[in-house]
Structure formats: C-alpha cells, structure tokens
C-alpha cells in the first residue's frame, strides 16, 4: 500500500515545520490537492539548494497532487529579505524577465512538459494591484508589531531594512491568496527561512475567507552537512543546475564525493528510491564504505533527474577515463567538460618538437626543464607518456585538432587550445 504523502515526507525527514500536521494528512488522504512553491528570479539558474523544495513538489506530483510553480517575476523585482543580512541590489526589469524565462525552462525539464504541473508568474497579478488597493485591501490586514516580530524582519532591525523589503511578506501572502481563490491552492511549501512569510499568508486568508478555511504551510529543514557547513557550497562556489555553469561531470562528481555521514540523508532527500532500497544502501556505508556504493547510486539518481540519461552516461565515462588515463577515448565535448577547470594555454596548429611545444605553450619555463621532464616520464600528451625529446607534437591528430591535453607530473593538467 502506498504511503500517504505526508508519511512519505516524514520518513524521509523532509519536514521541518507544518501548520497543522493532522489536518494536512487528512486533506491529502481524502482528495488530490493543489499546492505551490515559489522561486524568485535572482539569477538565471537554480542551484542544488533549490532542489530540496522542488523535490518535495515532485513527490506530491507523483502522488497525484497538482503543483503550481510560482516564478516570482513580481516579488523578484522587490527582493526577499529572508536569510539576508543586507539589502538586495534591485535588478532591472529586463534582467528579471531574462531570469524568469531561464528558470521556467529549468522547471519544465525537471517536471516534464506535459506533466500534472502548472507554471505561473506572480508578476501577472501583482502588477495589476494599485498602491491604494494594496494599502486598503491588504496592508490593513497586517499588524506592524506582528510583522516586526517575524524572524525575517527582526534579524534585520539592527542593520536596517527598507520599506520595500519590509512589505515582501505581504506580497507573498497576496500570492497565496490569489492562488487559493483562482486555483484552490491549499498548501504552500518553502525553505525553513520562509516560515514567517508562509504563516502570514495563511493568517491573511483566514481574515478574508474565514478562520475555517483549509490552507496549510510546510517548510523543509535547513540543510547542513555533517561538518556543520552549509550544504550546496564548495570551494569553487555554488553547484548550479545549468550545465553551462556546472557541467554534468562536475555535478556528478559533487554527489559522488559526499561524506559517508551525509549520503543516506541525501538519498532520502534527493532521490525517489524507496525505503527498502535506501536501507540496503545504508548497510553498505557501514559494511563496505570503501566501495562507495551509496555515493555512486546518489550521483546516478540526481544527475539523471537533473540532466538526463545521456549526460549521466557522459559523466560516468569521463570519470572512468580519468581513472584509467585513456584520455583519447573522450570526444571533444566530454574532454572539454573533463578539463574545464584546467589552466588553458594557447598553441599554434603546426607540428612542433615536444620541447619547443612545452616551452612555447608556457607549460615549461625552459628547454632544459622541458627536456628533463620528458626524459623522466613526467609529461603525457593526450594520455600518452612521452619520453623522447625528439618527438613531434601534431595538434591535428586528436580532438578534431581543437586542443591538446597535457599532463605534467601526476596531477597538473593543461588544456592547450589551438588559436
């Protein structure tokens, strides 16, 4: 028997707070509901931190409920103060619109073009509210003392908060009200820092529609790694869903390298594997951690969900090739993914003696050092270890003549591009 969606989320430890646990469980058992989660277009790509609430939305979708994804073209032009220590820099409306289109495309890839999901932009209704209507119809329902007590505002009082950001919780409440009246949306989902905004919306709906109105709020836990640091950030920055910002190979590697202490939690949050499968993988973490079976399955599932089967297979191939050293097995696209972070140097297309090639590219500082490294076996060209200083390098032989991959020593790679 299939679990109720609330029970499913509970065993996955995916719920932080909810306004009425029993009421929401009962509602989701007796009918298919509509629910929503919003994302403001502060950039042109989501990162993996955004995946957490939207994985929850996907679970509701698979359980037969109807998610509404709200792209905040209106609220994004104002700026959400949640989780911020300082005022956001306002974006131009052109930039907001560009980001709206980019995020909408990502959402369609995650949820499917024809699936039981709706994409809406809150600019469509917020932009139609005049200032006088906003103050009379909505502002009158909000008590300043209550607003000041919300964590999102209280945490900013010492450094200051603009009236613009102060009113953000009202705008988010208007979103919930609009979606409830227009589409019978009864549940809002958000991150842990959205609790105050979500409860403000519920309070407003109760004031307008009556206290018995069945609307609910649910937040996800703040995601921290076992070492106490914030999930989703690396030394190189955020892990993006856009393959142009974070390649599928880098994305796959991020999940593959997760700590044993975190991997079971992430399997619950970020995959659709059932309880029995996750429990089996949890056992392997205890009995054979060196095999990293749980990490490999996590990387496979999340990369497939975000980037698709073909990109997953490409990431796996790159991983295997870099381990074996058979670099020529990669095609041009795969090689560029694999060595995207390697230093890039420029070379010409003509054949050159290996010593001259290394010095002219700036990989070696002198011909003497180049000869020494070649003779000692410290140089590989496109995966081949070369020891003869008389050899010639022909850039046209591999990778469509676009580049040569050079390794000096055990780990130092260079991407030598033909100019």
Curated annotation (Swiss-Prot):
A motif ('KMSKS' region) lies at residues 230-234. One of its GO terms (molecular function) is ATP binding. A motif ('HIGH' region) lies at residues 41-50. Its EC number is 6.1.1.1. Keywords: Aminoacyl-tRNA synthetase, ATP-binding, Cytoplasm, Ligase, Nucleotide-binding, Protein biosynthesis, RNA-binding. It is found in: Cytoplasm. The keyword Repeat does not apply. The lineage of its organism: Bacteria, Bacillati, Bacillota, Bacilli, Lactobacillales. Belongs to the class-I aminoacyl-tRNA synthetase family. TyrS type 1 subfamily. Homodimer. Its main location: cytoplasm. InterPro entries: aa-tRNA-synth_I_CS (IPR001412), aa-tRNA-synth_Ic (IPR002305), Rossmann-like_a/b/a_fold (IPR014729), S4_RNA-bd_sf (IPR036986), SYY-like_C (IPR054608), Tyr-tRNA-ligase (IPR002307), Tyr-tRNA-ligase_bac-type (IPR024088), Tyr-tRNA-ligase_bac_1 (IPR024107). Residues 352-419 form the S4 RNA-binding domain. This is Tyrosine--tRNA ligase. CDD domains: S4 (cd00165), TyrRS_core (cd00805).
């Amino acid at each position: 028997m299939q679990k109720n969606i609330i029970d499913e989320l509970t065993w996955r430890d995916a719920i932080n707070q909810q306004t009425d646990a029993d009421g929401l469980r009962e509602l989701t058992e007796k009918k298919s509901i509509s629910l929503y989660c919003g994302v403001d277009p502060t950039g042109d790509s989501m990162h993996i931190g955004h995946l957490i609430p939207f994985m929850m939305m996907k679970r509701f979708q698979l359980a037969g409920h109807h998610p509404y994804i709200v792209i905040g073209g209106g609220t994004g032009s104002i700026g959400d103060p949640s989780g911020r220590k300082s005022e956001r820099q306002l974006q131009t409306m052109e930039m907001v619109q560009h980001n709206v289109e980019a995020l909408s495309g990502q959402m369609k890839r995650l949820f499917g073009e024809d699936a039981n999901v709706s994409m809406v932009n809150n600019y469509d209704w917020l932009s139609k509210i005049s200032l006088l209507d906003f103050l009379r119809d909505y502002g009158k329902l909000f008590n300043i003392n209550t607003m000041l007590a919300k964590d999102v505002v209280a945490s900013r009082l010492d450094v200051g908060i603009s009236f613009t950001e102060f009113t953000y919780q009202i705008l988010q409440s208007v979103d919930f009200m609009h979606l409830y009246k227009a589409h019978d949306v009864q549940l809002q989902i958000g991150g842990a820092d959205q609790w105050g905004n979500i409860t403000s919306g519920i309070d407003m709906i109760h004031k307008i529609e009556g206290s018995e109105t069945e609307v609910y709020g649910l937040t996800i836990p703040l995601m921290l790694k076992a070492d106490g640091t914030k999930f989703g950030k690396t030394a190189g920055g955020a892990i993006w869903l856009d393959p142009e910002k974070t390649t599928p190979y880098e994305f796959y590697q991020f999940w593959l390298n997760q700590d044993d202490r975190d991997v079971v939690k992430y399997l619950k949050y970020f995959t659709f594997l059932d309880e029995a499968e996750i429990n089996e993988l949890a056992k392997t973490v205890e009995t054979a951690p060196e095999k990293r079976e749980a990490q490999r399955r996590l990387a496979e599932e999340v990369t497939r969900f975000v980037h698709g089967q073909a990109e997953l297979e490409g990431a796996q191939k790159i991983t295997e090739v870099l381990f074996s050293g058979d670099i020529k097995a990669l095609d041009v696209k795969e090689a560029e993914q694999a060595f995207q972070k390697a230093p890039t140097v420029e070379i010409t297309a003509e054949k050159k003696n290996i010593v001259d090639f290394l010095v002219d590219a700036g990989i070696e500082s002198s011909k003497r050092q180049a000869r020494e490294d070649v003779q000692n076996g410290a140089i590989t060209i496109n995966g081949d270890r070369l020891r003869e200083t008389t050899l010639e390098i022909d850039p046209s032989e591999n990778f469509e003549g676009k580049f040569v991959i050079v390794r000096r020593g055990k780990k130092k790679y260079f991407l030598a591009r033909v100019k």
